[in-house]
Amino acid sequence: REKIGVMFGCFNYSTRVQLADRTTEKIGKIVTQKMDVEVLSYDPDTDRVVPRKVVNWFNNGPAEQFLQFTVEKSGGNGKSQFAATPNHLIRTPGGWTEAGDLIAGDRVMATEPHRLSDQQFQVVLGSLMGDGNLSPNRRDRNGVRFRMGHGAKQVDYLRWKTELLGNIKHSTRVNDKGATFVDFTPLPELAELQRAVYLGDGKKFLSEEYLKALTPLALAIWYMDDGAFTVRSKGLQERTAGGSGRIEICVEAMSEGTRVRLRDYLHDTHGLEVRLRQSGKAGKAVLVFSTASSAKFQELVAPYMAPSMEYKLLPRFRGQSTVSPQFVESTQRLVPARILDVHVKPHTRSMNRFDIEVEGNHNYFVDGVMVHNSPETTTGGKALKFYASVRMDVRRIETLKDGXDAVGNRTRVKVVKNKVSPP
């Protein structure tokens, strides 16, 4: 099979390619002028978005039609837009997919800024276990908003947490009761976390993977947010030297299954004796630590406590805090982004189709969305004889529960399109 032509998709002249210097340029101009530029490209070996040279330019003549895509993004006007031929390959969370097989509501892979350091991500994890929350961006933008709020007596603690996230743009407001709330700019890197924690039943769901990711800093923030410490002895007797007490942490906001998983995690990972019980007239769920485990837990989290919250520690554990803000430079990383609209683009004066070839990775980004760089026609004896395109309809038929806790879905999959065609 020599000199076999393999067909791939292309883009409309005006589709904007992201260059390595973070600017954009129309793909038609890059091709017609054979611009010697570097573009952003995804390197799967390092899981990074990196600069790569354009090594070939293709003007493949008129197209019958282009599909106009609008995809959510966090910056600018909140929308990525590009026009591709129906057979161009677009990257999705499940792999490469032809543009013509995508519909509104599907998700594609897009590059978005990641701003959080490992320390800051732990602040988010710990806060979500306590008083923090993540809410979707309601303006069809990619990313979710992280919010923290505390009463007037804990404003110093809130200020301490906010300083740990000090490089993230945020706004602060105080309500009529003196409670202070801090809202951070939408962060695309937290979108998947939001979807995993909030399953729609009003309670927070923390998976085994979530719990395994926790560090002592996250546990400290959880304790400072929702924990209470009752002193049982001031340590005046030899057998209680250093004092003793018992920790209770409210877990009412968590699902029933999550409460059990958290109790087991504390026992299995940290060797803590913890039990679940109902507290007060309202019967709120709390985790109660034994006296010995209370001291052991405080020893674990003491280096990560805010100075204003050290009253929740035994005297011998106070003054150990070593926490200081750790910021990192923003980097571009891949995240899923929802398609807002797909329609056939009206004919324009120029219907020519353009593509580029990128060195090494064979992909690039059009207005932030990851696309394949294959040219419209290539030749070579290793060309595939057929291409397969399968579309499956996935429907939820049953919710799987752990007690009263929804932990998954049973689904039915039906093949609704199965196309095999020569190139």
Curated annotation (Swiss-Prot):
Its main location: cytoplasm. Pfam families: LAGLIDADG_2, RecA. It is found in: Cytoplasm. One of its GO terms (molecular function) is endonuclease activity. This protein undergoes a protein self splicing that involves a post-translational excision of the intervening region (intein) followed by peptide ligation. The keyword Cytoplasm applies. Can catalyze the hydrolysis of ATP in the presence of single-stranded DNA, the ATP-dependent uptake of single-stranded DNA by duplex DNA, and the ATP-dependent hybridization of homologous single-stranded DNAs. It interacts with LexA causing its activation and leading to its autocatalytic cleavage. Belongs to the RecA family. This is Protein RecA. The gene is recA.
